[in-house]
Curated annotation (Swiss-Prot):
GO biological process terms, semicolon-separated: monoatomic ion transmembrane transport; symbiont-mediated activation of host autophagy; viral process
Keyword vocabulary terms for this entry: Activation of host autophagy by virus, Calcium, Enterotoxin, Glycoprotein, Host endoplasmic reticulum, Host membrane, Host-virus interaction, Ion channel, Ion transport, Membrane, Metal-binding, Secreted, Signal-anchor, Toxin, Transmembrane, Transmembrane helix, Transport, Viral ion channel, Virulence
Bilayer-crossing regions: 29-51
Location(s) in or outside the cell: Host rough endoplasmic reticulum membrane; Host membrane, Host caveola; Secreted
PTM annotation, UniProt: The N-glycosyl content is primarily Man(9)GlcNAc, with a small amount of Man(8)GlcNAc.
Protein name listed in UniProt: Non-structural glycoprotein 4
Membrane topology: Single-pass type III membrane protein
Any one of the GO CC terms: membrane
Lumenal side of membrane: 1-28
HAMAP family (UniProt xref): ROTA_NSP4 (MF_04091)
InterPro entries attached to this UniProt entry: Rotavirus_NSP4
Length: 175
């Protein structure tokens, strides 16, 4: 009985695979199958050929790792552009450069915020001092002599010459 279930399961899997292959081959999208197969063949060949080439390049040159890495990234970015992808592969060096640029910009903005905050604090202190000077202070008794300008009023007898110096005089002009 067990052998029959295993045989039945195997036949079901074969039938499923056959029906799947028939639906794939009947699909009009399969017109692109030769192109897809050729691209996959080229990629596989590049993969198989690049590993020994990289090993030789790493052994013969001291700085070849960066060169090979740059070449591989360039090749993959070119393939992605050919496939109309907007994304690109970046190396760690490029990511570090971008992170440094972002960190530098953040530092610059923090310094600007610090300067602006310092200026605002100084302005608030200045406004407080101006407010304190303009603040009306209550007094017990108000001296009105300052208001009506009578504090330094002198009488005619108190003037040195006996005349009021602010009195108008007669002036004659030559013609």
């Amino acid at each position: 009985m067990e052998k029959l279930t295993v045989l039945n399961y195997t036949l079901n899997v074969i039938t499923l695979m056959n029906s799947t292959l028939h639906t794939i081959l009947e699909d009009p999208g399969m017109a692109y199958f030769p192109y897809i197969a050729s691209v996959l063949t080229v990629l596989f060949t590049l993969h198989r050929a690049s590993i020994p080439t990289m090993k030789i390049a790493l052994k013969t040159s001291k700085c070849s790792y960066k060169v090979v890495k740059y070449c591989i990234v360039t090749i993959f970015n070119t393939l992605l552009k050919l496939a109309d992808y907007k994304e690109q592969i970046t190396t760690k060096d490029e990511i570090e450069k971008q992170m440094d640029r972002v960190a530098k910009e953040m530092r610059r903005q923090l310094e600007m915020i610090d300067k602006l905050t310092t200026r605002e604090i100084e302005q608030v202190k200045l406004l407080k001092r101006i407010y304190d000077k303009l603040m009306v202070r209550a007094t017990d008794g108000i001296d009105m002599t300052k208001e009506i300008n009578q504090k330094n009023v002198k009488t005619l007898e108190e003037w040195k010459s006996g005349k009021n110096p602010y009195e108008p005089k007669e002036v004659t002009a030559a013609m």
